[in-house]
């Protein structure tokens, strides 16, 4: 089966987060020689398929095995859940159609096209050396993500089945297939700052203390400020105010406080502690409360790593494009792999219609993506 046929089948399952809709049974049927592990909570389902090709004799011996003889373990990772399709599609979003060289359907780009490509590549992979190939799939990436990839990796750690390397099939490309590889992601820190004042009548300014005036005095040091200068892999960390709230809605009452909600997307140079230190210095003599919560940590996979190099070589060979190695964009499940010390990068389809009406992926793109993934498998197994 090729990537197109598999992707068409995957799209036909209406797997809106966290619904799995039986799609894992179909995927398991494609890999009868692979072992499976499944887990999940709160309606989320996760599937892990794995097979050891050409296991070394020492590995076969089980408890009598020598140490350090495990074959390289490579994992393809992705999600089968999709966001709700919304209205005004030209066709049923869960009945894939082919039109003018494109496959239309919810998840075509994000990320059933990528999953279909790596499933097809895995079916056609036949290494001659010891190699452990696995696939990790979740029904909760578009949602909270608490019981998805994160949970499955914790289970794999308990069973000593964590991979050495992984590719997450996120739709990373911007204009042409192969123009972008994510070799890391920025971290994300959410914050709430409350500046306190004294509520009162606007006609008696000496009896009140307006916290909005206080905010105005420090706003240039908070809003849009760069927290570091970045580096070759990361843009400068930046604090962005996303919401302001103050007052009772009356035009003659000054507020007792002003609440500022913000987010900082940050590089390895900035941490929650360094952000707190900076803000406390700015707010030193002002009555306030500050809350910070890190929702994800930044990570980077070396541009010269074996995984990055093999992927880059195969993109250049197959797509005739030199990919840009970058860390742009929001968070993804790749962060959960990195947290376990797993070498991880992200590569997948063009992302011009992700989460949009009439989501689509080109047929040529699926063909090339499958070839890239198969080339990566062959390159790693021959290394």
From Swiss-Prot:
<feature type="active site" description="Proton acceptor">
    <location>
        <position position="141"/>
    </location>
</feature>
<dbReference type="InterPro" id="IPR005941">
    <property type="entry name" value="DapE_proteobac"/>
</dbReference>
<keyword id="KW-0028">Amino-acid biosynthesis</keyword>
<feature type="binding site">
    <location>
        <position position="142"/>
    </location>
    <ligand>
        <name>Zn(2+) 2</name>
    </ligand>
</feature>
<dbReference type="GO" id="GO:0019877">
    <property type="term" value="P:diaminopimelate biosynthetic process"/>
</dbReference>
<dbReference type="GO" id="GO:0046872">
    <property type="term" value="F:metal ion binding"/>
</dbReference>
<keyword id="KW-0862">Zinc</keyword>
<feature type="binding site">
    <location>
        <position position="110"/>
    </location>
    <ligand>
        <name>Zn(2+) 2</name>
    </ligand>
</feature>
<comment type="pathway">
    <text>Amino-acid biosynthesis; L-lysine biosynthesis via DAP pathway; LL-2,6-diaminopimelate from (S)-tetrahydrodipicolinate (succinylase route): step 3/3.</text>
</comment>
<feature type="binding site">
    <location>
        <position position="355"/>
    </location>
    <ligand>
        <name>Zn(2+) 2</name>
    </ligand>
</feature>
<feature type="binding site">
    <location>
        <position position="79"/>
    </location>
    <ligand>
        <name>Zn(2+) 1</name>
    </ligand>
</feature>
<protein>
    <recommendedName>
        <fullName>Succinyl-diaminopimelate desuccinylase</fullName>
        <ecNumber>3.5.1.18</ecNumber>
    </recommendedName>
</protein>
<dbReference type="GO" id="GO:0009014">
    <property type="term" value="F:succinyl-diaminopimelate desuccinylase activity"/>
</dbReference>
<comment type="function">
    <text>Catalyzes the hydrolysis of N-succinyl-L,L-diaminopimelic acid (SDAP), forming succinate and LL-2,6-diaminopimelate (DAP), an intermediate involved in the bacterial biosynthesis of lysine and meso-diaminopimelic acid, an essential component of bacterial cell walls.</text>
</comment>
<dbReference type="GO" id="GO:0008777">
    <property type="term" value="F:acetylornithine deacetylase activity"/>
</dbReference>
<feature type="binding site">
    <location>
        <position position="170"/>
    </location>
    <ligand>
        <name>Zn(2+) 1</name>
    </ligand>
</feature>
<keyword id="KW-0457">Lysine biosynthesis</keyword>
<dbReference type="InterPro" id="IPR002933">
    <property type="entry name" value="Peptidase_M20"/>
</dbReference>
<keyword id="KW-0479">Metal-binding</keyword>
<keyword id="KW-0170">Cobalt</keyword>
<keyword id="KW-0220">Diaminopimelate biosynthesis</keyword>
<comment type="subunit">
    <text>Homodimer.</text>
</comment>
<dbReference type="Pfam" id="PF07687">
    <property type="entry name" value="M20_dimer"/>
</dbReference>
<comment type="similarity">
    <text>Belongs to the peptidase M20A family. DapE subfamily.</text>
</comment>
<dbReference type="InterPro" id="IPR050072">
    <property type="entry name" value="Peptidase_M20A"/>
</dbReference>
<dbReference type="InterPro" id="IPR036264">
    <property type="entry name" value="Bact_exopeptidase_dim_dom"/>
</dbReference>
<dbReference type="GO" id="GO:0006526">
    <property type="term" value="P:L-arginine biosynthetic process"/>
</dbReference>
<dbReference type="Pfam" id="PF01546">
    <property type="entry name" value="Peptidase_M20"/>
</dbReference>
<feature type="active site">
    <location>
        <position position="81"/>
    </location>
</feature>
<dbReference type="GO" id="GO:0009089">
    <property type="term" value="P:lysine biosynthetic process via diaminopimelate"/>
</dbReference>
<keyword id="KW-0378">Hydrolase</keyword>
<dbReference type="InterPro" id="IPR001261">
    <property type="entry name" value="ArgE/DapE_CS"/>
</dbReference>
<feature type="binding site">
    <location>
        <position position="110"/>
    </location>
    <ligand>
        <name>Zn(2+) 1</name>
    </ligand>
</feature>
<dbReference type="InterPro" id="IPR011650">
    <property type="entry name" value="Peptidase_M20_dimer"/>
</dbReference>
